[in-house]
A protein has these predicted regions:
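N-terminal targeting leaders characterized by basic, low-complexity, disordered sequences
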Residues: 1-85
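N-terminal targeting leaders only when they are immediately followed by extended low-complexity/repeat-rich tracts
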Residues: 81-90, 302
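N-terminal Sec-pathway targeting helices
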Residues: 88-106
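Non-catalytic, solvent-exposed segments at the cell envelope interface
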Residues: 94-97, 112-670
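Short conserved active-site loop signatures built around small residues
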Residues: 106-112
Length: 671
């Protein structure tokens, strides 16, 4: 992101920087992929020479599918999409290699070919059963990171597939491939054997080579992670991409009797595990490679945004730490209060504009308040420049987390204990951090501390929480649970509780492609409306805020545009008992009322209009970053008196992709 993008004319963020990740992700990298070669070249060549005489002429090609979906959001959760379609579970399942299909297909042709054919079929059936065992052994060895056992299993599997291929290439079985009905099953067997060979040569053997050269025991280095080891596995995943696409194309041509489905499915889960790591990581490989780089020095800010002090882009960044890549090791540093990390005011290079001060309030003159702007790219840029101004060190990007991620980390890595004896775990962390600690130390307290001491103590507990959570993530990292970490990251991306901004424009495009940049909608073809709320009064009432949205089915207008009626309901769930127990640090100055800002954005190329409110609330309209926006920067959501805003959003002309809604993440699912 160039600082010059932020002049008073409010030009688009990165508007000239749309990059096709798929075509460019392999260019400009500072490292090359690890190359792997199998040790069984002679045997491999022999097998493939046999297969050249068979009737399997399937060509390798890529098969991609995508599907849009209608998005209805409530409970403050939301999805952030960059336009890239993720694979559904069913589409991912098509990528798996159903080895046991071989057994089923062989049964179909038993008896068709007479005595010789029967003898061959029995032999292939025996070989197919051996394949099942060998595949189980191989998968088990790969999961256990046992390179020696995996090599042994691969050799056995290669030998078995060679035997089946040799049989299928004989004149008798070539003739069988032309027999009506049964012939297509013979060809399917041949195709499936080819898939086994492809998996062995192009996936398993490179994987075993990587495991041998970069064992997972070398992943953790002191208090950090080895960049070389991480890159080796990322390179492996990137290397098998085309192989997976080729297998998908071949699987689409396989025809087997429907009655065999039950028999096949009993083993499909085992085969699915072969590809699960790739399919889970696919969207994030370029992003992760950009983040860690080639081992040369990098510095990132790690902002812990506090949702109890909710802001449009997440929350108040009460504690900020660093992630450093130095001497080939990536490590997480200590967290410190935001005022110790960032300069009080953004430097001139940040170019905070008059329009930004008007739309998002003049508190944007403080660096710490940049997240009043829902565009995380912009907030992160200001934080990065403010850090550089204070410390004289430039950063490569900013990673943002909210307390919900802390709870998800602890659910995998185990509990931590704070200095006051409070245990945080995978079930209670959000409630404790965003509600209970405030009421323990800052209301009806008998701690022997005055207000200032109590505030400092609680801030210290939050900083210690972030530090311990990141430490246990590193120390307790278990590669065998990698899918759980990926799921956690996926959830954070979908909810916008994990966001990432890079200084480098190409790397920032990877974040956009992965859906975690937190940028405002800039793609008319994939429309996304924004519903954002920020607490303005200093308080901790974000715990009690609900943001719920409803969206109608679209109305197709005469000009081809589509209009949606949207209803936003802001609810304050605080009870009188909470109000009477709380002090001013928790409540602010409105006796439990939540005073703040609301910003409602149209999608790229679209419009927003026809505002109606339930209590006369005035909505001002303007334009920011080429997006229409309706907003109010002086509203109060009283307990028991929701603020309801209704309006119409129209997408760009010629766009039939369903509208999605992104909202500021709330804590209502954790109460």
């Amino acid at each position: 992101m160039n600082n010059n993008d932020y002049k008073d004319n409010n030009e688009n963020l990165n508007s000239e920087n749309t990059v096709d990740n798929k075509s460019s992700q392999n260019s400009g990298h500072r490292r090359s992929n690890v190359q792997h070669t199998g040790s069984n070249t002679a045997n491999n060549n022999s097998r493939h020479n046999v297969r050249e005489g068979s009737n399997n002429n399937s060509e390798h090609h890529s098969s991609n599918s995508s599907e849009g979906h209608h998005s209805h959001h409530s409970s403050g959760e939301h999805h952030s999409h960059s336009g890239k379609k993720r694979l559904t579970k069913q589409q991912k399942k098509k990528r798996t290699i159903t080895i046991v299909s071989i057994v089923a297909a062989v049964v179909v042709i038993i008896g068709i070919m007479g005595v010789k054919g029967l003898s061959d079929a029995k032999g292939m059936l025996k070989n197919a059963n051996e394949l099942k065992t060998e595949m189980n052994d191989m998968l088990g060895a790969v999961k256990a990171q046992d390179a020696e056992a995996a090599n042994t299993a691969v050799l056995k599997l290669d030998n078995t597939t060679y035997k089946i291929s040799k049989t299928l290439s004989s004149p008798l079985w070539k003739m069988a491939s032309h027999i009506p009905v049964a012939g297509k099953y013979v060809k399917s067997v041949d195709t499936l054997i080819g898939l086994v060979e492809d998996a062995s040569d192009d996936i398993i053997k490179p994987a075993v080579a990587t495991i041998s050269e970069y064992p997972m025991s070398g992943l953790k280095v002191g208090d950090g992670f080895s960049v070389t080891t991480i890159n080796a596995y990322l390179d492996l995943l990137e290397q098998i991409q085309q192989v997976v696409n080729n297998m998908t194309a071949k699987m689409n041509k396989v025809e087997l009797p429907g009655s065999m489905g039950t028999m096949i499915s009993s083993y499909s889960d085992k085969i699915t595990s072969l590809m699960s790591m790739y399919t889970d990581y696919e969207d994030y490989i370029p992003l992760m490679k950009a983040f860690i780089g080639d081992g040369s020095d990098k510095v990132y800010l790690l902002a812990a945004q506090n949702t109890a002090e909710i802001r449009a882009a997440g929350g108040f960044p009460g504690s900020i730490g660093t992630i450093r890549v130095e001497d080939g090791v990536m490590s997480i540093g200590d967290f410190n209060p935001v005022n110790d990390v960032l300069a009080t005011y953004p430097p001139d290079e940040a170019n905070v504009t008059r329009k930004e001060l008007k739309i998002f309030n003049d508190t944007l003159i403080y660096s710490r308040d940049a997240s009043f702007n829902p565009d995380f790219e912009r907030a992160a840029q200001i934080w990065a420049l403010a850090y550089e101004a204070k410390h004289g060190e430039s950063v490569d990007g900013v990673l943002s987390l909210t307390p919900t991620i802390i709870q998800k980390v602890l659910r995998i890595s185990g509990p931590i204990t704070l200095p006051d004896g409070t245990e945080l775990n995978g079930d209670n962390a959000v409630s404790v951090l965003q509600y209970e600690l405030y009421y323990k130390y800052l209301s009806d307290r008998n701690t022997g501390m005055d207000d200032s001491e109590a505030n400092d103590y609680v801030d210290g507990l939050f900083a210690e929480t972030a530090k311990q959570a990141m430490a246990v993530l590193v120390s307790g990292f278990d590669f065998k649970r990698i899918n759980e970490y990926v799921d956690m990251f996926n959830e954070g991306v979908e909810e916008n509780t994990i966001m990432l901004w890079f200084v480098d424009e190409q790397e920032e495009q990877y974040a956009k492609d992965a859906g975690c940049s937190g940028n405002l909608n800039d793609d008319p073809a994939n429309p996304e409306a924004g519903v954002f709320f920020s607490l303005y009064e200093p308080c901790k009432l974000g715990w009690f805020l609900n943001i719920d949205t409803e969206m109608s089915e679209p109305v197709i207008n005469a000009d081809g545009t589509r209009s949606y009626d949207i209803t936003v309901t802001l609810t304050n769930t605080i009870k009188r008992s909470n109000i009477t127990r709380a002090g001013g640090y928790i409540l602010g100055g409105f006796d439990g009322g939540i005073r703040g800002f609301v910003h409602l954005f149209a999608p790229a190329g679209g419009t927003i209009a026809n505002f109606e409110t339930n209590n006369g609330l005035k909505i001002t309209t303007d334009e920011y970053d080429n997006l229409e926006v309706g907003y109010n920067v002086d509203l109060v959501v009283e307990a028991g008196s929701p603020q309801v805003i209704k309006y119409t959003v129209t997408t760009a002309e010629g766009v039939d992709t369903p509208l999605k809604i992104r909202t500021t993440p709330t804590l209502q699912a954790y109460r």
